[in-house]
């Protein structure tokens, strides 16, 4: 905790110092760019006639480009902290891109398990919540199947790149290959397991991406005593794919994932459809389903239907209004939730 507090104080100091000196502003912003976000709102349960206010996220970050040279490549860093409940480090990594075809990222950052986890941040995703697939399979929040709840992040190293530049400037192929501790954030590796990930994204059009991914944890099973020198080198895996199309008129995104967790096979999918009504106003709808244990589908299947609108009158402020109908396996009747969330981004 002492280290986290030091990081938090350092972030605030950099944010305060960075704007100083008008003549040095552009130089500062190249090496040290402060940013942050604050998200909160109110949720209402019409069945219980109950509502509650909440602060969901409060984050500050410092990022910058240390090197940007056509010959020697590009070196970037990001340090991001969460201030909700107690200060904690979310992101802390360096990213070196030697050329388009090869780069390496090292530290604590969002792991490339699927599409939604890395391509959409908490301030750019169209609806308030991530899909069930992302929450349960990608260590994102309290619904995580493994109970790690690491905000979709992990500590490790990732190699990435893109190939075959097209006439309109986009690249046809993009890849990620990484090795992670698999223990979550702000923690040393507490076992001998490692999380291996691979993801391939193909862009037939600039607006269209098709993705496939596979990840697997290898190492001794925690339930097997190491003194017997007996290892179960297959603990769990994740695999799936998806598609994402976005144009000036709207977007469509869908993914399917499945995988084993401690002997149980789970699977899920989602589909999101959205339309830009005005430049500052859009509407979207999403269908989710998730089966926690495919051997007991009738008692472990959950369906969600979410519709929402997002209004962004200012570049640094937007509001989201969502309605969710939840068909949970433990409920005889579906539950309903109305959620209004506002966001400040700087």
Region spans (language model):
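Outer membrane beta-barrel
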Residues: 24-181, 192-194, 201-209, 272-275, ...
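Solvent-exposed loop/turn segments connecting transmembrane beta-strands
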Residues: 46-52, 79-89, 117, 185-192, ...
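Sec/Tat signal peptide C-region and signal peptidase I cleavage site
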Residues: 18-22
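Outer-membrane beta-barrel "beta-signal"
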Residues: 311, 334-346
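Bacterial N-terminal signal peptides
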Residues: 9-16
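Detector for outer-membrane/organellar transmembrane beta-barrel domains
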Residues: 201-294
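Bacterial N-terminal signal peptides that target proteins for export
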Residues: 1-8
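Outer membrane beta-barrel transmembrane domains
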Residues: 274, 280-320
